[in-house]
Amino acid sequence: MLKFPPLKPHKPIGNVFVYSQKNSFGSIVYKMANKDGKYVGLMETLPTIVNNKRQSYSPNATSYPSLLIQKLSVGPKRQGFGSAFINIAKKDSFKHFCNGNIHLVASDMYDGLHPPQVFYRKLGFQFNKSSGFTERKVDEFIAGKIPESGLYGLGDTYMFFENNVDKDGKMVEFMKRFKEKFPEIFEWL
């Protein structure tokens, strides 16, 4: 559980264009361009059912719907593009009956000096139960107790944003009936 709320509300990013397309594997690929038409980021998501018997993600359920973020890449960093993609994923999670649940594997393979675990933690993501060491390090960095160099080598970390695990599946069934009755609302999302 988070010991602190997300640090600050994210201001909306103006003048960006986001294009989405479903690929042949069922994933939804989002591409973002700035006002000049320059490519600034990509996110790939897939609605899934998490079979969580080992509780790699949420400790609250063994099987639940969740949106998997397979890939999130932005450049330049620290401009708000990653946060915009996460906000899109949160909305998309409801649109695809995942009840606001998101999960991913944060990896420092591409940028060991600036690990993504800090970014996801600031946005409200939680660590799984076996990532206690990584969780402590990231929380200490966010609190200003250790320098960023102390985060080097965190590796791969299972992280999740849990809204509603819907253990009995009633919420998913309700949302499917709701979508059939009011499809224009889901087109608007």
Regions from the language model: what does each represent?
Residues 1-79, 83-189:
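Non-catalytic substrate-recognition and accessory regions of acyl/acetyltransferase enzymes
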